[in-house]
Amino acid sequence: MRDIAVQATKEFSSLSVEPLLGDDSASSGFVCSLFDVLDFSIQDFVDREEEFAFTMAQYTELEGEKNTGQGLMCLATTDAHVEERWGEGYIKRKYGVHGLNSIWDEWGPDSGILPCPVYLRHCVLSAGRKGGEEGVAYRSFVEETFLADRKTTIEEHLARRPEIMLMEPPASVLGRYSG
């Protein structure tokens, strides 16, 4: 689990998108950072991010000519989907050594799962890369992204845990998780 998870406090979740249910779903959206996958192919990226489902999502740039396009988005999924993709018993083989029997199905709103602190810091820094803490991407991320409990925003979580933003990633992920 990349040597950054904190199992004792269930701080090992990553970040994904899931559908918004209800009346507002047709007009909903969020602001995110786009990045090019230059060092390897999209297939390499999909293989690395093994625990997700993926979709191509429409986007509109906020600045300049407001170009539109499509980008690959990581989606929440199910244990069955992961096992279908990687083979029966994959979760047990890969994550069982860490004491986990599930990647998705056991981690609902009442599970107590929290974001991996080093990864969360990386996401927050990335969101603020353009515009800082007052930038639209940063504000959208901290105000419109929720923990697994579906109630607590990233902003509220960081207010309770400000030390997260002071954590340095270990050498094994320093370049990748530095915002």
Task: Tell where the protein language model's regions lie, with residue ranges.
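Glycine-aromatic micro-motifs
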Residues: 1-179
